[in-house]
A protein has these predicted regions:
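Contiguous beta-strand/loop segments that form the cofactor/metal-binding neighborhood of enzyme cores
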Residues: 185-270, 303-315, 354-358
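N-terminal Rossmann-like dinucleotide-binding module
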Residues: 1-50
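Predominantly a Rossmann-like dinucleotide-binding segment in NAD(P)-dependent oxidoreductases
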Residues: 127-217, 343
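Beta-strand-loop-alpha-helix segment that lines the small-molecule cofactor/substrate pocket
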Residues: 63, 69-128
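C-terminal helix-rich "cap/oligomerization" subdomain common to oxidoreductases
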Residues: 7, 26-27, 47, 70-72, ...
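Active-site loop of classical SDR/Rossmann-like NAD(P)-dependent oxidoreductases
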Residues: 16, 38-39, 294-306
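Conserved SAM-binding strand-loop segment of SAM-dependent methyltransferases
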Residues: 52-58
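Short, Asp-centered acidic motifs that coordinate Mg2+ and/or phosphate
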Residues: 31, 70, 148
Length: 358
């Protein structure tokens, strides 16, 4: 079964998908759509001679092509809702890049419509497929009952995007949605119960302060601490800094149970496993997934994501990363942004106005 792909949005992430799909058998990219001429040229250059592309400025023309089986939506965050509304008029499969949407009402709309859609709807939260994360999950039974999870990301500022759309909360959903939905998804993946309350403190203290776009000053935060309480008493914490480049590690993850602790770093090739009873620790080498043919920006996770999506489509299975998981990840980000704005902790059931349980 050969699958024909169309890519909507061919900036940095769209071209990342193209590089991955080039290495996967029985896949053909037949069309791309992007209103920006330079981005369309990037897609052509990335494809090289692997695919003969049809180029569109308007994504609606791409969605109208009957020979396209799977659509990858990698357009700017704020466009996701309008593109998905059009996609839901078709039966095509879709990989929708993170974040699923930039606000709660749009997220609920996509979630509800996805339940009736004939095609697979997959959300691009590929961090869960990184080898260090998979290694943590493989050893989680060795640390007993999980009590705490800490994720630290200290990295470089946001890169420049077309028309600088990623400088403003209204177009990104906010830093804790745009960037950190990945980490909230990992928390939801690893923690044994549901989140019930969130508190965040953060601000824009260093980055983009001297930038102006059409007279507007960027308002995206560049650092934050986020604390999450879970219904069975577990706790999770996110430590984010966007002006901390040049460190040895970009991400550090610590998962603590009542019998031990797991630690890993990204980039890195080891997991440290601590045993309280034996008062000992040992290092476990991370085994890279042998299926990976393209490492890309995310340590091979995007490649595995595509393999899993293709397998899901061919076998008629439910997606591993469905709209509910995508929705849950943005709920935490949006609630954290609200907590920073109000200075108060946010009860998640109240935040959702009793419409959904996460």
């Amino acid at each position: 079964m050969k699958l024909n792909y169309g890519i909507i949005g061919t900036g940095m992430m769209g071209c990342e998908h193209i590089r991955n799909l080039k290495k996967i058998p029985d896949v053909k990219i037949v069309a791309i759509a992007d209103p920006n001429e330079r981005s369309r040229k990037w897609a052509e250059d990335t494809c090289e001679d692997a695919f003969k592309l049809r180029l569109y400025e308007d994504y609606k023309e791409l969605l109208a092509q009957e020979d396209i089986d799977v659509v990858v939506i990698a357009s700017p965050n704020f466009t996701h809702i309008e593109v998905m509304r059009e996609l839901f008029k078709t039966d095509k499969h879709v990989l929708l890049e993170k974040p699923m949407c930039t606000n709660l009402s749009d997220g609920i709309e996509v979630l509800e419509k996805s339940k009736k859609h004939k095609g697979v709807v997959w959300i691009g939260l590929e961090y869960r497929f990184m080898s260090p994360i998979q290694s943590l999950i493989n050893h989680v039974n060795e640390i007993g009952n999980i009590k705490m999870l800490s994720i630290r990301e200290h990295r470089f500022p946001f890169l420049e995007k077309v028309d600088n759309w990623n400088r403003f909360n209204e177009k990104t959903g906010g830093t804790l949605v745009e960037k950190c939905c990945h980490f909230f998804d990992l928390m939801n993946l690893m923690m044994p119960s549901k989140p019930i309350k969130i508190y965040a403190s953060g601000g824009q203290d260093v980055n983009h302060l001297d930038e102006r776009y059409d007279g507007k000053v960027p308002d995206i935060i560049d650092n934050s601490f986020v604390l999450i309480d879970y219904e069975d008493g577990e706790r999770a914490m996110l430590d984010l800094c966007m002006f901390a480049e040049a460190g040895k590690y970009e991400q550090e993850i610590v998962l603590t149970g009542d019998r031990g602790k797991l630690e890993t770093h990204i980039p890195g090739n080891e997991v440290l496993l601590t045993n309280r009873q034996e008062y000992s620790h040992r290092t476990v080498e991370i085994k890279e997934d042998s299926r990976v043919k393209e490492v890309g920006f995310h340590h091979g996770a995007s490649y595995i994501e595509h393999l899993e999506l293709i397998d899901c489509i061919k076998k008629g299975n439910q997606p591993l990363v469905d709209c509910q998981k995508g929705f849950d990840s943005i709920v935490l980000g949006l609630a954290a942004q609200e907590s920073i704005k109000t200075g108060e902790s946010i009860n998640l059931n109240d935040f959702l106005k009793n419409e959904y349980e996460i």
